[in-house]
């Protein structure tokens, strides 16, 4: 297993690259954007072991209103490709949690999900109307939210993508959600109310706890790493708080 510092993804999947470019573009519009350093053994990993080829690249940043902007690109055994992104807000600001995941097995997109998840009570009332008007009629295979998914908003979008038009439509939805997020972040002001700050901390902790209930994440990683490494990766890289 080899850890490297990588500056751009080695994946050439067109859909992942389109989404990645879009997310990075919106991220660049945030104020005071700075990179975050993390243990190299957890950030960028490459293995060329036959049958267990592995590539994981992580990007970590912070910005005004956001404590952590995380993007993960991964490929397992040259079959399974993943794009994972979570923008965690700074609890001192009234900003939702942006989350997006794309899972592709060979050429089939089995899961595509995006949401602006509330980070405090009734926060979603501020932006629900900005998301609810999106036309999703093109999608034929919307998926059911898992039991632990009560952390998501009522406008969470989750589907399998069957064709190029659905892939294109999903990219547009992600772009729209990011536009709303950036708009909310630019209008948000620093809060000093300790009660609401604590509420936002508690919401983020619950978001991370619920995400950790998704056993598919650990099951994939356990095929390539031992349990100790997987637990550390999930708790320190994916869903830390």
Swiss-Prot record:
GO biological process, one term: phytochromobilin biosynthetic process
Reaction equation(s) it catalyzes: (2R,3Z)-phycocyanobilin + 4 oxidized [2Fe-2S]-[ferredoxin] = biliverdin IXalpha + 4 reduced [2Fe-2S]-[ferredoxin] + 4 H(+)
Enzyme superclass (EC): oxidoreductase
One Pfam family recorded for the sequence: Fe_bilin_red
Keywords for the protein's UniProt record, in alphabetical order: Oxidoreductase
EC numbers: 1.3.7.5
Cross-referenced NCBIfam families: PRK02816.1
Function text: Catalyzes the four-electron reduction of biliverdin IX-alpha (2-electron reduction at both the A and D rings); the reaction proceeds via an isolatable 2-electron intermediate, 181,182-dihydrobiliverdin.
HAMAP family xref list: Ferredoxin_bilin_red
Protein name, as recorded: Phycocyanobilin:ferredoxin oxidoreductase
Annotated source species: Prochlorococcus marinus (strain MIT 9515)
């Amino acid at each position: 297993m080899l850890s490297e510092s990588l500056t751009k993804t080695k994946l050439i999947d067109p859909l992942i690259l389109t989404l990645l470019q879009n997310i990075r573009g919106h991220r660049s519009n945030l104020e005071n954007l700075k990179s975050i350093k993390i243990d190299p053994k957890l950030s960028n990993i490459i293995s060329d072991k036959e049958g267990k080829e592995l590539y994981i690249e992580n990007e970590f940043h912070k910005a005004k209103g956001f404590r952590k902007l995380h993007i993960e690109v991964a490929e397992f055994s040259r079959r399974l490709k993943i794009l994972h992104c979570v923008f965690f807000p700074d609890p001192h600001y009234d900003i939702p949690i942006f989350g997006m995941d794309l899972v592709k097995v060979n050429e089939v997109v089995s899961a595509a999900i995006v949401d602006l998840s509330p980070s405090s009570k009734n926060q979603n009332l501020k932006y629900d109307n900005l998301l609810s008007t999106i036309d999703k009629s093109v999608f034929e295979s919307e998926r059911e939210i898992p039991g632990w998914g009560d952390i998501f908003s009522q406008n969470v979008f989750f589907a399998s993508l069957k064709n190029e038009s659905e892939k294109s439509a999903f990219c547009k939805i992600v772009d729209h959600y990011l536009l709303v997020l950036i708009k909310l972040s630019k209008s948000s002001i620093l809060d000093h109310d300790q009660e609401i700050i604590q509420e936002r901390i508690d919401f983020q902790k619950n978001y991370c706890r619920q995400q950790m209930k998704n056993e598919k994440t650990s099951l994939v990683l356990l095929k390539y790493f031992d349990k100790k490494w997987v637990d550390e990766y999930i708790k320190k890289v994916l869903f830390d708080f």
